[in-house]
From Swiss-Prot:
Chain segments annotated as transmembrane: none
Subunit structure as annotated in this protein's UniProt entry: The glycine cleavage system is composed of four proteins: P, T, L and H.
Any Pfam family matching the protein: GCV_H
Family: Belongs to the GcvH family.
Keywords in alphabetical order: Lipoyl
Domain Lipoyl-binding: 19-101
BP GO annotations: glycine decarboxylation via glycine cleavage system
Designated name of the protein: Glycine cleavage system H protein
Cofactor stoichiometry and binding remark: Binds 1 lipoyl cofactor covalently.
One GO location term (cellular component): cytosol
Residue positions where N6-lipoyllysine is found in the record: 60
């Protein structure tokens, strides 16, 4: 079964073996508003936990996308680059940002489960 975890920067990550899918949360899209541009990391690039892995721009603001764990980018979701509005309609499923091969699964331990993330989002107001 795939496990979904959440970061304090409002990214979600779904683990499947040693690969993971990363995107932004529904809460993030609500804060950003209508998404108009997405920039994703290059396939084959290495990313580090909490490092910048792209940009999402909305009618309200531009925000960096951070990777919740370290790894190598193995796939990008070109569909959201071509049509950024898809991120608003289904941010936690079809509008994933990138897939990566994880180099250190223990980094998942510092992330939140759904209940913890919902509490964090409510309490932080961010």
């Amino acid at each position: 079964m795939s496990e979904v975890k959440y970061s304090k920067e409002h990214e979600w990550i779904k683990l499947d073996g040693d690969t993971a899918v990363v995107g932004i949360t529904q809460h993030a899209t609500e804060m950003l508003g209508d998404i108009v541009f997405v920039e994703l990391p290059e396939i084959g690039s290495s990313v580090v936990k909490d490092g910048n892995a792209g940009v999402v721009e909305s009618t309200k603001a531009a925000s960096d996308i951070y990777t919740p764990v370290s790894g190598e980018i193995i796939e990008n979701n070109q569909a959201i680059v071509d049509d950024p509005a898809k991120v608003n309609s289904d941010p936690e499923n079809e509008a994933w940002f990138f897939k990566l091969k994880i180099t250190d699964k223990s980094e998942m331990d510092s992330l939140m489960n759904k209940e913890e993330y919902e509490k964090f989002s409510k309490e932080s107001g961010s």
